[in-house]
Design a protein with these regions (language model features):
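SF2 helicase catalytic motif II
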Residues: 255
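P-loop NTPase catalytic phosphate-binding loop
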Residues: 44-46, 101-232, 252, 260-320, ...
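N-terminal, Lys/Arg- and Ser/Thr-rich interaction peptides
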Residues: 1, 30-42, 175-178, 185, ...
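Generic recognition of flexible, low-complexity loop/linker segments
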Residues: 31-33, 240-244, 280-281
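Short helix/loop segment immediately N-terminal to the Walker
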Residues: 230-251
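Basic- and hydrophobic-enriched, low-structure N-terminal and domain-boundary segments
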Residues: 1-142
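Conserved ATP-driven motor cores of ASCE-family P-loop NTPases powering translocation/secretion/packaging/pilus
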Residues: 57-67, 295-369
Length: 369
């Protein structure tokens, strides 16, 4: 028996020891399952007939028990639903199992210069998030980042904006006229939408209906770009499945910070116009290379329509994690979902649409040195 197999066997025995005292009240039930350890996860194999019920609660209990017990040897990835796999075996009693995705070790925070981050992008075509986690925005379009003050949300928005401004075109919509807008201004980006801070005597100072109308105007301009690109792709491409890259268009990133603040003081008609425009960009923008990155403290339905939230692939929540504040962005979770990394700029992440990622896992956003 080789060293790798010995280590695998020791890990399986350890997992069985952990489950033995917690999973079942009847010790005899520990003989009614087996475990398989794969490169991408673990399979719990019930040996039928069994005297316990397998359901979502049972699946979640196994996850919660092993979540801490396997750290830091493995990082468990919380699936969005119970995962059942079919096994190739001649034994009818063991032809199916519960799959728990996990990765060996833990992902690490990037502490790099912006030049190093950009170099990573040009090597892979994906935006780095951690050393072994990155964002393929073509496969997984649009992003939403939530977190309370002090969570590191604004810092990470600035990091993303710097990256996206180098690899494509970008616009900054910032109702506070704060970090994001100042960064865009410093970089010489003219596509900045901020409120009017100095009163001109017309009552249009600060955030409110007039500012939201300015935002809608900017978004409708981007919508026109989207339709123009779609028209040119349709007219000039012979491919059935294609996108903006075939015609050499750059990706266009729309950053909206503190989205909830945009709606302050606006009437219903203007709010509806904003949300309808936002929805069209989110739903139709992918093929044309239009990508939205939204940030807010909480992704409540009154701020982000359900169709918008469901169409966003990259979801990040930074700061304190509990069942109350995860229910808007991660409604699948009903309790503490995994072992947090701790520290500023940490939280949880899920990337839908990319087969390399299968659920929710811890994140620590990059630190630019």
């Amino acid at each position: 028996m080789g060293f790798k197999q010995k280590k695998t066997n020791l890990m399986l025995e350890y997992i069985k020891d952990v489950l033995r005292y917690i999973l079942f009240s009847n010790s005899d039930q520990n003989a009614e399952y087996d475990l398989l350890l794969k490169d991408d996860g673990m399979i719990f194999v019930p040996i039928y007939p069994i005297t316990y019920v397998i359901d979502e609660a049972f699946y979640n209990k196994i996850f919660n028990v092993l979540n801490l017990a396997l750290t830091p040897e493995y990082t468990l990835i919380r699936p969005l639903t119970m995962q059942v796999v079919v096994l190739e075996t001649a034994n009818l009693s063991q032809e199916r199992g519960l799959f728990f995705p996990m990765r060996k070790g833990t992902a690490n925070r990037l502490n790099e210069t912006m030049e190093q981050i950009i170099q990573r992008f040009y090597q892979t075509g994906r935006i780095p998030i951690m050393d072994i986690i990155d964002w393929d925005f073509v496969k997984a379009p649009h992003a939403i980042i939530t977190g309370v003050s002090g969570s590191g949300k604004s810092y990470y928005m600035k990091v993303l904006f710097q990256i996206c401004s180098i690899i494509g075109n970008s616009i900054a919509i910032d109702p506070k006229g704060s970090d994001l807008a100042r960064l865009a201004h410093k970089q010489g980006n003219e596509d900045i939408v901020i409120p009017q801070f100095i009163s001109s005597g017309n009552g249009e100072q600060g955030i409110g209906g007039k500012f939201l109308q300015d935002v809608i105007k900017a978004l409708k301009n981007i919508e026109s770009i989207m339709y123009e690109r779609q028209s040119r792709i349709y007219q000039n491409s012979d491919k059935v499945s294609t996108d903006y890259r075939e015609l050499g268009f750059k990706p266009y990133f729309v950053f909206i910070d503190e989205l909830a603040a945009l709606l302050t003081g606006a009437n219903k008609a203007v709010k509806d116009d904003f949300q309808n425009t936002l929805t069209r960009l989110i739903v139709l923008g992918r093929e044309a290379g239009i990508y939205l990155i939204l940030a807010m403290q909480s992704a409540r339905a009154e701020y982000v329509p359900t169709i918008v939230r469901d169409s966003i692939s990259l979801r990040i929540q930074l700061g304190r994690i509990n069942s109350e504040n995860t229910r808007f962005l991660f409604p699948e979770l009903n309790e503490m979902p995994m072992v947090p990394m701790g520290g500023k700029g940490t939280g949880i992440i899920s990337i839908a649409g990319d087969s390399r990622y299968s659920g929710i896992e811890p994140i620590a956003t990059p630190t630019i040195i």
